Amino acid sequence: MSRAVRTLALGGLVLVGLSACVSVPRGQGSGAAVADHVSDSARQAEAARQAWLQAHPNWSFQGRVAISKDRNGGSGRIDWQQDGPRYRVQLSAPVTRQSWVLTGDTTSGAGRLEGLDGGPRSGPDAEQVLLEATGWTIPVNQMPDWVRALRIADAGAARVDLDAAGRPRTAQQDGWTIEFLAWTPAGADQPELPQRIEARNGEAKVRLLVDQWTVSP
């Protein structure tokens, strides 16, 4: 990776304290502790939530993200749009007005990154494209399920711990440890969805705070 590309990618996102970036506002649903026992009614409610989400594959969210690996890191706004297996993710730094757009398909795993100095980059592995361009490790093909806490156990997670409501609280998958720290309350048109998520894999960390969820009918 060229030094110029690394400088652009890391310099464009405002470097700030990660915890400050993803602090949960007051009044938002908070996460619960891992439960020793989950009632049958809670398991049924979670199964219904999962079924509803699988029946609604088109969705989007806006929020804030903080990414770090070793001593490199940055934070900014994130706008994720999902249309079945296809996604479009825009990362932007309001202060510098720079932005990057990653598009891809979770079925094929391929991706394309735009907004880099020197033009777009694309390849058969979106995660590798992002790693080579920015130095960041982000499991983009797992993220659509992770951000909704959907099919975690079915996706090959080595371990899943639940809270008393039957929702995933922590999970381990493909070397990553994912924590679901806060949830948005259910509304008239959608079930509970994660609000704050932290994922770690060695020195790689991703912290996400969702400000708004939209699920298409």
From Swiss-Prot:
NCBIfam families: lolB
Subunit structure: Monomer.
UniProt keyword list: Cell outer membrane, Chaperone, Lipoprotein, Membrane, Palmitate, Protein transport, Signal, Transport
Species the sequence originates in: Xanthomonas euvesicatoria pv. vesicatoria (strain 85-10) (Xanthomonas campestris pv. vesicatoria)
Annotated lipid attachment (S-diacylglycerol cysteine): 21
UniProt keyword rRNA-binding present: no
Signal peptide start and end residues: 1-20
Main location (coarse class): membrane
Keyword Lipoprotein: yes
Compartment annotation: Cell outer membrane
Protein name according to UniProt: Outer-membrane lipoprotein LolB
Functional description taken from the UniProt entry: Plays a critical role in the incorporation of lipoproteins in the outer membrane after they are released by the LolA protein.
